[in-house]
Amino acid sequence: MKRLAFSYTYQYNDLNLYEKGHRTYNTTYQQHTLETSYSDVWLKDFRYDIGLQFEYIHHEDLLYNIDIPTPPHLKPQHFFNYFIRMHYSTLDKGYYPSKGFDFQAGYTIYTDNMAQYKGHSPFSGVHVSWHSVYSFGKRFAILPSIDSRILIGRGISNFYGNVLGGDVSARYLLHQLPFAGIHHIEPMKKSLLIGSLKLRQRLANKHYISLAGNIGITDNRFQHILKGEYIYGFNLGYGFNSDFGPLETSIGYSDYTDDMKLYVNLGFF
């Protein structure tokens, strides 16, 4: 189904950023997003979008750790971004699926005047994710996944830098990648690759327990990604698939933050 769409989104965000488990910044900001796109659906499950996005970010407050030698100067920013996105999904359910896979990929060019960024060539980003479910019987399932994002170019805005953390992608920032064991946002280098494996057992009709582990690699040069910094994490979780959305709690650990924390999620996201 071909469709031409226009959308406007306003968000008021209160965001904490961490460095290896220690909070370094807190910022509140307003985000205005205006987007126009053309989309089509092929073969029932495959969808693509091509479009132009305008974003304006206005920072109101910045709190930072006094140990930070050079706190960032967060001035109002605007961007004109070109994007193409692809999404192919055969999952049988949005939450707690029992079969299928979900593949997403995209490429975005970031500019501040539709041609350049700060007087030089624009920077760009590539993201690819693959999540799948393999069930063994009616109760047990294995869920492998891969998430990656690569930034190309120089002078990359901090607002679009790679970040990881949380149980689901894009919870706090659109380009945020999930990572078991880290429940807040941790900035990463220009190339980021994450491999994950979750074991899930259904106890009763709507009750689940799970054990998830993942490995992340980050480096500023994608061609040397396997020589980059390795990050490990895991969590043990319980979930209830309620009529109001998933009610979940988990406890996790990561060597990157070297701490264990409890995480709670209530309802749809």
Roles of regions detected by a PLM:
Residues 1-5, 44-48, 92-96, 136-142, ...:
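Repeated loop/turn-to-beta-strand initiation elements of outer-membrane beta-barrel proteins
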Residues 6-16, 50-56, 101-111, 144-150, ...:
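Transmembrane beta-barrel strands of outer-membrane/channel proteins
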Residues 8, 36-40, 52, 84-88, ...:
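Residues on the lipid-exposed face of transmembrane beta-strands in outer-membrane beta-barrel proteins
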Residues 11-17, 55-61, 89-93, 108-116, ...:
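Sequence/structural signature of outer-membrane beta-barrel proteins
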Residues 198-232:
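C-terminal hydrophobic structural anchor segments
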